[in-house]
């Protein structure tokens, strides 16, 4: 009897609790539909507002007279707005947009460092190591020795693509999903799927938008290189930021989906060219239709960089270089320049250090860099190699004036000093190098005129290798020029360098007194860049005052109304 009463009591309590819950639901429903119904209806009709970042226009680059090298053009990008792409539909929508891109023969951004086909392999490009490391972290903190096949399987599992029969398609979709995760795409940061698409594709995407939620078209800007061959030796290119670069940049200024200067002035002047992001508030209705878009914080475009280059002189330098190489090939013997197939030319203002022209041959067009990269990278003529700033070459007789300057500065010779040239230098019994001529007794002026080896053998011997190297450095050889972009340092002959370079010989070679003779005429281990040789000759012409070489003349605001910086001449040293 007691058990029955206890059961009845519990049943009564349960009934009361359930009744209270239903009463609560009823009250809430009444509040939503009757008391606050109009208010909530108005909110739904008004839509939802979210904030989106606005990309700034990248600063442009002009020649010294305002003629364009690198400018911007208006483009259209495909973006994936995560806020309106339910996770359950992501793979399906991405499959549809990929199919449309392939149908139109267009490419999309895919930085997944794994091949499209099985057996899956890792990519081997220059940034592969950091990209693969980042991929393994995102795929599931895989170990360093995990192979590409296992990594891909893990990624397909992660993105629910492991049961897809078409493995190549699964790889493509995974590439997009990976990039979305890697770049931090979210409701306020859309993912850029493809850049600079043609207007025909813009129209088609708008037609199919009802079937591809989250796929949108955004107006943007892209780099355009005017006369791309003329700027290839110093302008540089931009590209999507990679994992290694992202580790180095200020995260408050860059997104993983940003483009960044990769080399040349695009890289050196990145902070000047980048600009500052703005903010836009976008109001959308319940179906995702944009009701309004308001810029609440305008983007600030990057600055305009005025270079020191004279575009006309640059064009003349490139034409002249190509013409001279062809002339040498057609008229000279093979051992006297007939095999020449490449070169560089640099023109410098001796008083200011401004680089007026800097050209390489063979060259390439910046506009075609990415589309032709696979061919350019394996071209045996190395058009991508910047011979002006990074190629180092034995200078030969160009080096002789530095020995003459050193000899006079150290009191070894003066203007009237005479050296006997009898064709053979006989100071050593076991090593007697020769001159091409037999000039008799000559002074420095005549020795330079006829490029007499004997005069500089003797002057160099009396100076000693340390003084020769020191004065060469003071005149601009084997030291940084000051240029803003990447450069090789070259090297000046010294006993230490000589033995270091020959340590692997059997037996290893050691420095001897006779080596100074070859160093004195620009041979042995002397190797310098064309840019350094231009700095050196400019220093000689400027009475020993070595100027810092530079490519940036002035920095102005994007609209050219305000001068941000004017680069003044800088004296590095006086010899």
Segments the model singles out, each with a brief description of its role:
Residues 1-273, 277-298, 326-344, 350, ...:
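Membrane-proximal periplasmic segments of bacterial cell-envelope enzymes
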Residues 223-225, 314, 491-492:
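A short acidic, often aromatic-flanked loop/helix-cap motif at beta-alpha or helix-coil junctions
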Residues 16, 21, 218, 308, ...:
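Compositionally biased, intrinsically disordered low-complexity segments
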Residues 85, 193, 222, 257, ...:
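A general boundary/transition motif marking the beginning of the first structured unit of a protein
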């Amino acid at each position: 009897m007691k058990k029955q009463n206890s059961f009845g009591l519990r049943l009564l309590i349960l009934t009361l609790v359930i009744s209270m819950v239903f009463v609560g639901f009823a009250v809430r429903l009444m509040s939503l539909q009757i008391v606050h119904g109009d208010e909530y209806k108005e909110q739904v009709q008004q839509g939802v507002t979210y904030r989106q970042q606005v990309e700034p226009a990248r600063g442009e680059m002009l020649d010294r007279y305002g003629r364009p090298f690198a400018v911007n053009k208006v483009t259209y990008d495909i973006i994936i707005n995560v806020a309106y792409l339910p996770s359950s539909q992501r793979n399906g929508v991405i499959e549809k947009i990929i199919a449309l891109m392939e149908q139109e023969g267009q490419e999309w951004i895919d930085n997944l460092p794994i091949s499209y086909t099985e057996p899956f392999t890792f990519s081997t490009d220059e940034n592969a190591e950091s990209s693969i490391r980042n991929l393994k972290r995102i795929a599931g903190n895989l170990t360093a020795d995990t192979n590409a096949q296992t990594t891909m399987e893990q990624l397909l599992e992660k993105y629910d693509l492991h049961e897809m029969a078409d493995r190549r398609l699964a790889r493509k979709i995974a590439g997009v999903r990976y990039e979305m995760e890697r770049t931090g795409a979210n409701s306020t940061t859309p993912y850029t799927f493809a850049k600079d698409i043609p207007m025909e594709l813009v129209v088609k995407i708008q037609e199919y938008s009802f079937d591809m939620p989250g796929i949108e078209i955004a107006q943007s800007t892209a780099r355009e290189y005017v006369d791309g061959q003329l700027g290839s030796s110093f302008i540089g290119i931009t590209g999507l930021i990679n994992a290694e670069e992202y580790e180095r940049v200020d995260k408050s200024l860059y997104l993983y989906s940003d483009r960044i200067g990769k080399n040349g002035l695009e890289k050196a002047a990145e902070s000047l060219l980048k600009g500052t992001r703005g903010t836009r508030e976008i109001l959308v209705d319940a179906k995702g239709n944009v009701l309004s878009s308001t810029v609440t914080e305008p983007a600030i475009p990057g600055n305009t960089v005025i270079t020191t280059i004279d575009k006309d002189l640059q064009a003349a330098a490139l034409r002249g270089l190509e013409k001279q190489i062809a002339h040498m090939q057609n008229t000279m013997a093979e051992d006297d320049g007939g095999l020449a197939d490449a070169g560089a030319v640099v023109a410098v203002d001796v008083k200011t250090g401004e680089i007026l022209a800097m050209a390489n041959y063979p060259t390439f067009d910046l506009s075609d860099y990415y589309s032709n990269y696979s061919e350019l990278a394996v071209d045996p003529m190395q058009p991508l190699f910047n011979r002006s700033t990074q190629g180092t070459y034995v200078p030969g007789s160009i080096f002789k004036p530095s020995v003459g300057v050193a000899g006079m500065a150290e009191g070894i010779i003066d203007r009237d000093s005479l050296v006997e040239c009898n064709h053979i230098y006989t100071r050593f019994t076991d090593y007697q190098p020769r001159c091409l001529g037999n000039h008799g007794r000559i002074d420095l002026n005549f020795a330079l005129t006829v490029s007499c080896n004997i005069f500089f053998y003797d002057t160099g011997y009396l100076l000693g290798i340390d003084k020769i190297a020191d004065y060469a450095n003071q005149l601009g050889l084997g030291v940084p020029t000051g240029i803003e972009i990447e450069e090789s340092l070259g090297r000046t002959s010294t006993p230490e360098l000589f033995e270091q370079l020959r340590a692997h010989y059997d037996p290893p070679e050691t420095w001897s007194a006779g080596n100074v003779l070859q160093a004195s005429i620009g041979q042995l281990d002397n190797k310098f860049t064309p840019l350094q040789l231009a700095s050196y000759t400019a220093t000689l012409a400027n009475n020993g005052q070595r100027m810092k070489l530079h490519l940036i003349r002035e920095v102005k605001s994007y609209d050219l109304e305000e001068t941000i910086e004017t680069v003044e001449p800088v004296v590095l040293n006086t010899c």
